[in-house]
Amino acid sequence: MATLRVDEIHKILRERIEQYNRKVGIENIGRVVQVGDGIARIIGLGEIMSGELVEFAEGTRGIALNLESKNVGIVLMGDGLMIQEGSFVKATGRIAQIPVSEAYLGRVINALAKPIDGKGEIIASESRLIESAAPSIISRRSVYEPLQTGLIAIDSMIPIGRGQRELIIGDRQTGKTAVATDTILNQKGQNVICVYVAIGQRASSVAQVVTTFHEEGAMEYTIVVAEMADSPATLQYLAPYTGAALAEYFMYRERHTLIIYDDLSKQAQAYRQMSLLLRRPPGREAYPGDVFYLHSRLLERAAKLNSLLGEGSMTALPIVETQSGDVSAYIPTNVISITDGQIFLSADLFNAGIRPAINVGISVSRVGSAAQIKAMKQVAGKSKLELAQFAELQAFAQFASALDKTSQNQLARGRRLRELLKQSQANPLPVEEQIATIYTGTRGYLDSLEIEQVNKFLDELRKHLKDTKPQFQEIISSSKTFTEQAEILLKEAIQEQLERFSLQQ
């Protein structure tokens, strides 16, 4: 019979006791009672916060949105196909946040800031909360710097300033995305960081936008956040906040940023889906009661910061889709009331070949001429009024048998003004060329031309002005004023081009 070696056992026990590392941690644990349709109901998790991240046993993450007396409603940040009833869930003690850094420029990412462009991982040392508080009133200053879109109709009559929120609204297939992407293309060389957020779009549409950015060299200063139509509702709901967090990172580093939300109608629909599955009471159009807060807390993050915070800015261009031109629906009226103006895109104008199809009469910018350079104010001051009078006269002329000479001249001038506002896609114009174009139309130099000739003449005029009168561009860009010398140079160029054009015909 073997004898017990007491001293050896004693030695082993002593070593084990010395090696024992006492770790006591309290974890907030719950159990899944129901899962499906992107929603999980959990019992337990007694100390959880609203909006806190949770982690399921198989690795999926979720956000706590409904805190009820008997259970917690979690929205899943993934398909959750492997989550089983009865499995454990752990609260992380953290609110949703994403990594942020300069390395995100030129990349395509999802709502969790993970790259989806196949170009490898993104290294980031800092992080920001996906939902952070908007700058206070004291932290802001009024909008005073223009953000040029490159579109004559907008920059001359519905100007957008850095730090403004301007809604782009219209039916489907009226060119809303084209207006937004052209604005991004026009920021090349302007030291503006752009963030394009695609919510619930077709993957082919997003790929087309990214290809355009690459071809035009815009990806160097742009981040694309994309959640496609087949993404979970939770990620479509989060995508705009992720984009805003990235834009804020640059804004608080004294940079100017532009963010496009394409489009907020899809985000509202994703939020409605989540809310109905969480059994929240539905309101108007089955949206939950806090759908206004969904958009207001997002758009209020756009701001022009004061000098103490570095005068950075975040300009937001949210897009909202209407059904058959109904701007009195719930989501359009909500976003109109939050933003500092709106650009209406009309299906009738689009089908009539007027592109961008901007209805200048009912579009408005509440910042107004504060967001224009002096030269643009001098030249384009009355153009919106002239176009409004033309539209009124045109409606009257349909029923009038004979018009007096003054009315006929006004109609002819209005048609030419409307023609000069036409621009092809991905062809934004610098502000100096816009000023030359508007001056030519409003001063009557186009009256002698046929309407079909207007755009050809203007293209040639802009090229002629650039080649033979480079001083014109220098005067406008340096002084921001339409001086007498600039006017003389422009008049000379117009006269020369009119003579050349008449000889060509």
Swiss-Prot record:
Location(s), subcellular: Plastid, Chloroplast thylakoid membrane
InterPro entries in UniProt: ATP_synth_asu-like_sf (IPR023366), ATP_synth_asu_C (IPR000793), ATP_synth_asu_C_sf (IPR038376), ATP_synth_F1_a_nt-bd_dom (IPR033732), ATP_synth_F1_asu (IPR005294), ATPase_a/bsu_AS (IPR020003), ATPase_F1/V1/A1_a/bsu_N (IPR004100), ATPase_F1/V1/A1_a/bsu_N_sf (IPR036121)
Site feature: Required for activity: 363
EC number: 7.1.2.2
UniProt topology in membrane: Peripheral membrane protein
Matches recorded under Pfam families: ATP-synt_ab (PF00006), ATP-synt_ab_C (PF00306), ATP-synt_ab_N (PF02874)
Keyword tags: ATP synthesis, ATP-binding, CF(1), Chloroplast, Hydrogen ion transport, Ion transport, Membrane, Nucleotide-binding, Plastid, Thylakoid, Translocase, Transport
Enzymatic reactions: ATP + H2O + 4 H(+)(in) = ADP + phosphate + 5 H(+)(out)
Cellular component per GO, a single term: chloroplast thylakoid membrane
GO MF annotation: an example: ADP binding
Main location: plastid
Binding annotation for ATP: 170-177
Purpose of the protein: Produces ATP from ADP in the presence of a proton gradient across the membrane. The alpha chain is a regulatory subunit.
Recorded family membership: Belongs to the ATPase alpha/beta chains family.
Quaternary data: F-type ATPases have 2 components, CF(1) - the catalytic core - and CF(0) - the membrane proton channel. CF(1) has five subunits: alpha(3), beta(3), gamma(1), delta(1), epsilon(1). CF(0) has four main subunits: a, b, b' and c.
Name of the protein in question: ATP synthase subunit alpha, chloroplastic
Source taxonomy: Eukaryota, Viridiplantae, Streptophyta, Embryophyta, Tracheophyta
